[in-house]
């Protein structure tokens, strides 16, 4: 057995598998996209079988590209899109319905009904979350309500519920392990983050039988061993974390006050609050950053539904760019005298507004507005939303923000223009790491440290390396004016919802 770690990064639009060597360097990568299903407006689904196929394909591809065999791999780490719900037959392992994705809004009216019953405070106090369709609990309730025979089968213990990690572990271990980790559990709306356990009151409200829920483990733990037939040898699964928590670990944000922001399909900012459960007064989420050796570290999280998705809209919807990397160059050529604002509420607005009914809008267009201005507005919308999140975090964390340094990762951070504009609008330094695969790196560290082949936490944190720091260059008057325009645009969008 070698010091290699296989990290499986199961995302919203594609699955990536990365083999890291003993020096925490990328040795091999596999990636495969899969189909998105939109049965109705606001509904988003995945086929769990297609996800499973991409996991096998990319893992084998990464191992092959690394030039190693399964016997060289010390452990597997799994990180995944959070909140997405899978329900499958315990006997056959077959899903009873497509996975309902975190972006799916079909349970909005049910969430409103629960709010009118005065239950949001109950959920928030126990889970740190808001009553929103984003989270797993109401999605699971929908499946149990709408799939014929599901309630009775679930009550008999015939059905299993899991976030994507749980489903993959079940499949990888041949149905021998029915487990999840604390970070994924904390996103379900039925896990008590104070007691660190499934909550009977919440499962009763949502009519979810406890028997269908997985065992919850630390992020670095024994999650089972893969079936030897899958990769040519049995490999222990020793690390699991939701994608944003894994990125927090990969960015070595281990100290209270450190924060990172990941820019993928959406944008997710996490602020480490240590052992303190900080209750947000600004509609941020209180969540579990990670749990190691039985000790829970908490975080404040701000979730933005549309980040990279805005660039995809430019490419696939407006067709003003041919490829995502073109966006920064196009934005740079925009007319500086035009103040065009895109509020990308394609599926509602996330933190700190949490309005599922808001819809996208563009303000400030003139006859001279063209592709360059649209590109700039799309990229700036991500920066503005990040500013909103960080302002809310500073208020909750009682920080003046002067010492803020934001560590960034995800596909969008490769754009120098976007990162410079982010620093300008935040009025804070933005650090881009050498290794951009921070989500995979974080879960690889969980697995590698558990296996004893990767360094301990303190040494791992010291090894974090910066590629470039972006410092604010925009003058205060310009920044103030742009932020005022953005807030006006958001206000008008919310009023129209």
Swiss-Prot record:
Q: In which pathway does it act?
A: Polyol metabolism; glycerol degradation via glycerol kinase pathway; sn-glycerol 3-phosphate from glycerol: step 1/1
**Keyword annotations of the record:** ATP-binding, Glycerol metabolism, Kinase, Nucleotide-binding, Transferase
Which lineage ranks, top first, belong to the organism behind this chain? Bacteria, Pseudomonadati, Pseudomonadota, Alphaproteobacteria, Hyphomicrobiales
- Binding positions for sn-glycerol 3-phosphate per the UniProt entry: 12, 82-83, 134, 243
Catalysed reactions, semicolon-separated: glycerol + ATP = sn-glycerol 3-phosphate + ADP + H(+)
As for what it does, the entry says:
Key enzyme in the regulation of glycerol uptake and metabolism. Catalyzes the phosphorylation of glycerol to yield sn-glycerol 3-phosphate.
Q: Which family does it belong to?
A: Belongs to the FGGY kinase family.
Give a Gene Ontology cellular component term annotated to this protein: cytosol
Q: Which NCBIfam families match?
A: glycerol_kin, PRK00047.1
Name of the protein = Glycerol kinase
The activity regulation comment is: Inhibited by fructose 1,6-bisphosphate (FBP).
């Amino acid at each position: 057995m070698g010091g290699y770690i296989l990290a499986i990064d199961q995302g919203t639009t594609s699955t990536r598998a990365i083999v890291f060597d003993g020096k925490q360097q990328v040795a091999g990568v596999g990636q495969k996209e899969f189909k998105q299903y939109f049965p109705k407006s606001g509904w988003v689904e995945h086929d769990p079988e297609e996800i499973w196929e991409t996991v096998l394909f990319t893992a084998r591809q990464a191992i092959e590209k690394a030039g190693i065999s399964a016997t060289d791999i010390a452990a597997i780490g799994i990180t995944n899109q959070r909140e997405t719900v899978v329900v499958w037959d315990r006997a056959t392992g077959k899903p009873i319905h497509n996975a309902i994705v975190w972006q799916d809004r079909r349970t909005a009216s049910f969430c409103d009904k629960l709010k009118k019953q005065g239950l949001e405070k109950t959920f928030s106090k126990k889970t740190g979350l808001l009553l929103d369709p984003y989270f797993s609990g109401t999605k699971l309730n929908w499946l149990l309500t709408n799939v014929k025979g599901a309630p009775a089968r679930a009550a008999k213990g015939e059905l299993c519920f899991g976030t994507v990690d749980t489903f993959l572990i079940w499949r990888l271990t041949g149905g021998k392990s029915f487990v999840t980790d604390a970070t994924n559990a904390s996103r379900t709306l039925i896990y008590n983050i104070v007691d660190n356990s499934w909550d009977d009151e919440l499962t009763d409200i949502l009519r979810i039988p406890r028997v269908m829920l997985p065992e919850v483990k630390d992020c670095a733990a024994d999650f089972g061993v893969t079936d030897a037939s899958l990769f040519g040898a049995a490999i222990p699964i020793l690390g699991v974390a939701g994608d944003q928590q894994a990125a927090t670990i990969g960015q070595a944000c281990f100290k209270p006050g450190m924060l990172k922001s990941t820019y993928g399909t959406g944008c997710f900012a996490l602020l480490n609050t240590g052992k303190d459960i900080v209750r947000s007064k600004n509609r941020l989420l209180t969540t579990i950053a990670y749990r190691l050796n039985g000790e829970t570290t908490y975080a404040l999280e701000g979730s933005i539904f549309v980040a990279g998705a805005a660039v995809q809209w430019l490419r696939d919807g407006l067709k003003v760019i041919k490829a995502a990397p073109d966006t920064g160059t196009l934005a740079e050529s925009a007319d500086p005298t035009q103040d065009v604002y895109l509020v990308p509420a394609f599926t509602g607005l996330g933190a700190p507004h949490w309005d599922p009914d808001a819809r996208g809008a563009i303000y400030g267009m003139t006859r001279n507005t063209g592709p360059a201005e649209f590109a700039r507005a799309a990229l700036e919308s991500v920066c503005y939303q990040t500013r909103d999140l960080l302002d809310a975090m500073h208020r909750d964390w009682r920080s003046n923000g002067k010492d803020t340094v934001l560590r960034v990762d995800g596909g969008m951070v490769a754009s120098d223009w976007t990162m410079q504009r982010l620093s300008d609008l935040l009025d804070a330094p933005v650090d881009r790491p050498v290794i951009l695969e921070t989500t995979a790196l974080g879960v690889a560290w969980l697995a590698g440290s558990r296996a004893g082949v990767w360094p301990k936490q303190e040494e791992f944190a010291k090894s974090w390396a910066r590629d470039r720091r972006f410092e604010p260059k925009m003058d205060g008057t310009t920044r103030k004016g742009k932020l005022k325009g953005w807030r006006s645009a958001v206000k008008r969008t919310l009023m129209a919802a």
